[in-house]
């Protein structure tokens, strides 16, 4: 299921590819900085969905050193996003961004499949 990701530019009028997991420039820059801090330029950002949160599902992020058998990976801006097959069905066409604001610094997901999201943006329902 390895597919190249399209570069996402939030100010662009180009459509986001609905079959991949997209990454903003801001998120890619943050991942590259975190990889430098860890001293491992091969780390991949794993994005996953778990049950929980105020809307039913929650997003999670961690670093991965290797791919699992059921993983899809998407390369964008010198960063590889990894998602397992179960989470992929909920995340198709989503965009991962990184923001810094009053709520703190965090990765957020804009998910076109979500019918509702919580106010903090970390949980959703389908």
Curated annotation (Swiss-Prot):
Claim: Metal-binding is one of the keywords in the record: yes
Molecular function terms from GO: 2 iron, 2 sulfur cluster binding; 4 iron, 4 sulfur cluster binding; iron ion binding
Cofactor binding mode and count: Binds 1 iron-sulfur cluster per subunit.
Gene3D superfamilies given in the database record: HesB-like domain
Keyword line: Iron, Iron-sulfur, Metal-binding
Cofactor: iron-sulfur cluster
Region Disordered, annotated ranges: 1-21
GO biological process per UniProt: iron-sulfur cluster assembly
Sequence positions that bind iron-sulfur cluster: 54, 118, 120
NCBIfam families reported for this sequence: iron-sulfur cluster assembly accessory protein (TIGR00049), PRK13623.1 (NF010147)
Self-association state and partner proteins as the record states: Homodimer.
Family from the record: Belongs to the HesB/IscA family.
Role noted for this protein: Required for insertion of 4Fe-4S clusters for at least IspG.
PANTHER family to which the protein is assigned, alphabetical: IRON-SULFUR CLUSTER ASSEMBLY 2 HOMOLOG, MITOCHONDRIAL
Protein name as it appears in the record: Iron-sulfur cluster insertion protein ErpA
């Amino acid at each position: 299921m390895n597919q190249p990701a399209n570069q996402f530019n939030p100010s662009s009028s180009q459509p986001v590819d609905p079959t991949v997991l997209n990454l903003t420039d801001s998120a890619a820059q943050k991942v590259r900085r975190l990889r430098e801090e860890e001293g491992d330029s091969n780390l991949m950002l794993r994005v996953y969905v778990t049950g929980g949160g105020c809307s039913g599902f929650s997003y999670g992020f961690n670093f991965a050193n290797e791919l699992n058998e059921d993983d899809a990976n998407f390369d964008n801006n010198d960063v590889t996003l990894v998602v397992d097959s179960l989470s992929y069905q909920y995340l198709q066409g989503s965009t991962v961004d990184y923001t810094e604001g009053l709520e703190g610094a965090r990765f957020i997901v804009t998910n076109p499949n979500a019918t509702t999201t919580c106010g903090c943006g970390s949980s959703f329902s389908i």
